[in-house]
């Protein structure tokens, strides 16, 4: 499948700790088998050097919004023009991919002619460069299972899809809230199967700060770019997340149809809220706060 998959990414500047974890992530992509084509976008510091040293394709120019943030539409468009691959995967540049990634994509492709494959990240504190000259994956995955924290269903860090899936993409700013939910919504609205690959191919998100964004994390989630992305996302009774996946790729490679995951989680959260409210007198006597009780509430299971 080497010629059939192209991974595309828009890294941040390769400076300090973010430079270390991006180099870790992108190097891991070169180790999956068969090796995919990899396209790195942007003029950010260190991008060209990283591409040259790892034998990647580098496309320097990319359309940006008024704040200088790259636009998803141009990245998708340029990738399909520059590569002959049948499949593409947009991956955030701090995500370490396991060897099972390409195998998972192949399973999904054999089942569906059209699809969107996504996955939840597991957050892990990684401070040093990984040594890829030895068996790096097994120790890292063991540490991930021991120390990592599985992100919520909103933590979507890759999108894999066949050529021609995304057309008429609005000017969404990448790395800002709502751009990833838009990708899931687009597929679901068109009847395209959305496959959650998390159980089969766990991905590692290396934790980092938000110093690369002028307004910090607040700008990413609640700044004007987030507001603009929400406008392009459109009306919503709810956000499309990994809970909106129609299928789940199991650890044994089987595809399981999923129903009503979002609705079940919403019902559990509503029931827990009712429990918290009804037990207020008892909790008050015990000195338990509502916020602490809610924080201990129902967690997602198997989603």
Language-model features, listed with the residues they occupy:
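Short, hydrophobic beta-strand segments that form beta-sheet elements in well-ordered domains
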Residues: 36-43, 117-118
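C-terminal catalytic/acceptor-binding lobe
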Residues: 5-11, 172-303
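Conserved catalytic core of nucleotide-sugar-dependent glycosyltransferases
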Residues: 80, 96-181, 185
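Anion (oxyanion) recognition and catalysis
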Residues: 30, 52, 188
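Short loop->beta transition adjacent to catalytic acidic/histidine clusters or analogous donor-positioning motifs
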Residues: 4-5, 27-39, 56
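Active-site-proximal specificity loops/subdomain of glycosyltransferases
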Residues: 40-91, 98-99
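Short, charged/polar "capping" segments at the starts of alpha-helices
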Residues: 16-18, 45-50, 125-128
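N-proximal low-complexity "stem/linker" segments adjacent to membrane-targeting elements
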Residues: 1-27
């Amino acid at each position: 499948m080497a010629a059939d998959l192209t991974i595309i990414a828009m890294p941040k500047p390769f400076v300090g700790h973010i430079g270390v974890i991006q180099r870790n992530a992108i190097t891991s992509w070169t180790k999956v088998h068969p090796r995919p084509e990899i396209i790195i976008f942007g003029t950010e510091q260190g991008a060209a050097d990283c591409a040259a040293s790892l034998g990647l394709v580098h496309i320097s120019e990319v359309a940006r919004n008024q704040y200088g943030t790259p636009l998803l539409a141009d990245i998708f468009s340029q990738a399909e023009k520059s590569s002959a691959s049948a499949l593409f995967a947009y991956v955030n540049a701090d995500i370490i991919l396991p060897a099972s990634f390409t195998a998972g994509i192949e399973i999904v492709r054999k089942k569906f002619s059209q699809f969107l494959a996504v996955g939840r990240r597991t957050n892990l504190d990684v401070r040093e460069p990984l040594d890829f000259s030895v068996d790096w994956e097994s120790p890292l995955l063991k540490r991930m299972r021991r120390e990592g924290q599985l992100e919520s269903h909103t933590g979507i860090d890759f999108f894999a899809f066949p050529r021609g899936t995304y057309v008429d993409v609005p000017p969404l700013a990448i790395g800002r809230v709502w751009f990833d939910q838009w990708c899931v919504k687009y597929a679901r609205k068109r009847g395209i199967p959305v496959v959650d690959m998390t159980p089969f191919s766990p991905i590692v998100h290396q934790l980092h700060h938000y110093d690369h964004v002028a307004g910090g994390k607040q700008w990413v989630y609640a700044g004007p770019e987030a507001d603009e992305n929400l406008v392009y996302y459109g009306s919503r009774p709810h956000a499309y997340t990994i809970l909106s996946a129609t299928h789940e790729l199991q650890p044994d490679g089987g595809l399981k149809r999923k129903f009503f995951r979002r609705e079940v989680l919403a019902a559990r959260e509503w029931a827990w809220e009712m429990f918290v409210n009804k037990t207020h007198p008892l909790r008050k006597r015990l000195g338990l706060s509502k916020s602490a009780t809610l924080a201990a509430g129902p967690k997602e299971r198997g989603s």
